[in-house]
Regions:
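N-terminal intrinsically disordered/low-complexity leader segments
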Residues: 1-18, 196-197
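Amphipathic alpha-helical segments enriched in hydrophobic/aromatic and basic residues
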Residues: 12, 31, 40-41, 62, ...
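Membrane-embedded alpha-helical bundles of multi-pass transporters/translocases
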Residues: 38-41, 52-54, 153, 162, ...
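Short glycine/proline-centered loop/turn elements that form peptide/ligand docking sites
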Residues: 10, 29, 38-40, 62, ...
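Amphipathic C-terminal alpha-helical segment
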Residues: 107, 114, 144, 158-178, ...
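Generic hydrophobic, amphipathic alpha-helix propensity
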Residues: 16-27, 44, 69-80
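Amphipathic alpha-helical packing segments from all-alpha helical-bundle domains
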Residues: 75-82, 95-98, 102-110, 116-119, ...
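Helix-turn-helix
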Residues: 18, 22, 30-64
Length: 197
């Protein structure tokens, strides 16, 4: 992560943790409604219901909030896939593929704009290493639980799925076809599972 965008403090008390979460939630809500350049720390503080001074105790600038939100999404996505893989270990791969495709679509459908902002700013915020690490976590869990999966093909599949859902989420609402995105995800996962040795 680039210097100057790390949070000022890591909250230890429950109230402080809640405030930090509220800041991230307010930021996500604002970014779902308007472009990044139209969201300021003042807007975020106001939406959170705190003073700008309080916000600056947690984050030095808007980029640090965006970076923390990005890391949170990466963590959530990695945990989601790890849990899905664990849930379907030894069970129907078809059911895993269906649930994974549907879950991804629902996540991006709900937070299309904010996830777009997050993904488009990974490199600028110096988060590419963290993004690759999160994807590797998913890849490792998948190859551990499903013997015979090629880790390189797992990487390509995860990248293809993420790109598919992200690209669909960034289209204007009248052009979004989530069933098409689901089908592409199913096909990519199906090809991966069919490639097992």
């Amino acid at each position: 992560m680039r210097s100057g965008i790390k949070p000022r403090k890591t909250p230890k008390q429950q109230r402080s943790q809640r405030t930090r979460e509220e800041i991230l939630e307010a930021t996500a809500h604002l970014l779902n409604d308007r472009p990044l350049d139209e969201v300021s720390t003042n807007h975020i503080a106001q939406k959170t219901g705190i003073s700008i001074g309080t916000l600056y105790k947690y984050y030095p600038n808007k980029d640090s909030i965006l970076a923390d939100l990005s890391l949170r999404y990466m963590q959530e996505d990695a945990e989601l896939f790890e849990n899905l893989f664990e849930k379907y270990k030894g069970r129907s791969l078809k059911d895993l593929i269906e649930e994974a495709a549907e879950t991804l679509v629902q996540i991006h459908r709900k937070n299309a704009r904010v996830r777009g902002v997050v993904y488009q700013n990974f490199e600028r915020l110096g988060l590419m290493t963290e993004a690759q690490s999160a994807r590797r976590r998913i890849q490792t869990k998948g190859t551990e639980l499903f013997s015979g999966l090629d880790s390189a093909l797992m990487w390509v599949t995860l990248t293809a799925i993420s790109s598919t859902v992200f690209a669909m989420s960034q289209l204007s609402p009248q052009h979004r076809n989530w069933e098409f995105a689901r089908n592409l995800c199913r096909q990519a996962l199906g090809l991966l599972m069919a490639s097992r040795a």
